[in-house]
Amino acid sequence: MGFSGKISSSFLRQSAVVQIVLVNAVVFVIVHIAALFGIGYVGEWLMLPQSWTEVMSTPWTLLTYMFAHFDFLHILGNMLCLYCFGIVALDLMTPRRFVATYIAGGLAGAAAYLFAAEFVPSPGLIGSSAAVMAVAAAAVLTKPDYHVRLWLFGLVKIKWIALFYVAFALLATRADASAVCAHAAHLGGILADRKSV
């Protein structure tokens, strides 16, 4: 088995949560390496544009935006929460359903963002926040008192982690008019797939 075959085999042995985290991490690294070599448009190529008209000419962005990040704290916060809620969600649903929930949340977030962008100018959308919020909502709505062990805090109910994550997502968004569109995407993700489990 060649090197690429070993990597592929190792990837497929991971849980669905780890697979999505790895895809996000690899895309993040590729975007930043490309930027170092003056190929900054790679990130823009993955970003969801601000209008349906532009999306029609770049339809792949409906999927790619939810696996891409520009900012380290953005990907770190999203992946930590995805891992935390994903472990719970995988106890409640199949891996296939888990991935479907992630993608449904991302697509719902994209639709909500594009609707809001019709009224408020925005530069485009990137990041997995909406998709992660769909996973978090699926876990919290089913098992709000489920405990996870956090390194510094011990056992914590996931409903409190979800509350912190939503607050983090809202506070981490730029404090300008375009933030309305980002918040719309987050809300779209939360409401995306409440019947997942």
Task: Place the predicted regions along the sequence by residue.
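A detector for small-residue-rich transmembrane helices and their helix-helix packing motifs
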Residues: M1-S196
